[in-house]
Structures are given as C-alpha cells and as structure tokens.
C-alpha cells in the first residue's frame, strides 16, 4: 500500500497504481477464498519444504557508513535525525522519516526536490534496512531456528558458518514466488 501511495503522490501520471502482493500471482476470491486459505493453513507446517525463508540479500550495513559520512548539503544536515528516525520507527516508510526529518530542520521542499533528496538518502535507507536484516536473522539463528536464505551474499555474513543457516543458490523473481509457496513463513525487511 505504501508503494502505491508513493506512486500516486509523486508520479500521478502513472494511472491505476495498486498493491501487488508478492505471495503469488492469483488472489483468493471473497469469503470462499478466505475459507480455502484457512483450510490450507491447517496442517501446512507438515507440508512445507521450508519453515522460514528469507529471499533478501545480505549486505553489511557498516559498508554504507563512509557514504553517509561523506554526504553533502541538505542530506548531510538531516543525516543524523533521518538515521535515528528510521532506526527508532522501523514501521515507518523512508518517505515518512524523511518528511519528519525535513520538518524538524524547518526545510520545505517541492515534490520534485523531495524526490531528489529521497534519492540522495538511499545509502541511509539501505544502511538501516541492512541493519534490521542482520538483527532479525541473528535472533532467528540464535533461537536455533533453521533459516533458508538464497544467494552467495550470505556466505560473507557473520552467520555464514551457523548450522541453522542454509544457503541456497540465488533465485530470480519467479523462483522467489516458488520459494514463498514452499515456506511456512517467508519474511523480508524493506524500507
């Protein structure tokens, strides 16, 4: 929903923005679909190939820090508050955190300028996203829960040698839908 709202606000010439659920290509129809989904969920744990899967890549959030330190202009001015806001309010979108950071510093931008600044804070967005990915994966693995991950980036993670981390070959978008279908839980951390 947040992506659709963003497109509708900043790119109004794109008609018919909508949410696209990553869980599959077909949606359940009405109450019958809901009842069917509930029936399918019962006993699903025994039928799923994976308990928990994570399609996202691993990037060390610390790798973004030099880019953030070297930021310029408005971006440098709002960097500390923006990062703090994103870390303290993970439920908020990056756009909301940016709006609040700009408001705190009394900076008023046109929509076009806002998009330029949003593009400029991407390293900060990726930093926080990677930070939360690392923390979430750590909690799962420390709990002794097996986590299925995809792609070689996980071999470089601090968890690469964990007996609970199963690293698979990278998957494309279509294959990721198949992984989700085979998973009891599939999670992601996004900005």
Predicted regions and their residues:
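Nucleotide-sugar donor-binding catalytic core of glycosyltransferases
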Residues: 3-33, 46-191
């Amino acid at each position: 929903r947040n992506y659709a709202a963003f497109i509708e606000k900043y790119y109004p010439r794109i008609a018919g923005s909508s949410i696209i659920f990553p869980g599959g290509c077909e949606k359940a129809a009405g109450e019958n679909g809901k009842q069917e989904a509930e029936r399918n969920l019962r006993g699903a744990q025994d039928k799923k190939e994976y308990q928990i899967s994570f399609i996202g890549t691993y990037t060390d959030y610390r790798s973004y820090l030099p880019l953030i330190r070297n930021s310029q202009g408005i971006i440098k001015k709002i960097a500390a508050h923006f990062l703090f806001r994103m870390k303290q309010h993970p439920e908020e979108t990056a756009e909301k955190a940016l709006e609040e950071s700009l408001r705190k510093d009394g900076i008023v931008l046109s929509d076009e300028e806002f998009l330029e600044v949003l593009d400029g804070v991407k390293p900060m967005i990726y930093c926080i996203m990677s930070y939360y990915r690392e923390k979430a994966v750590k909690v799962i693995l420390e709990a002794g829960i097996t986590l299925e991950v995809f792609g070689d980036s996980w071999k470089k993670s601090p968890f690469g040698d964990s007996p609970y981390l199963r690293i698979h070959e990278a998957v494309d978008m279509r294959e990721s839908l198949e992984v989700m279908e085979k998973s009891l839980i599939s999670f992601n951390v996004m900005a």
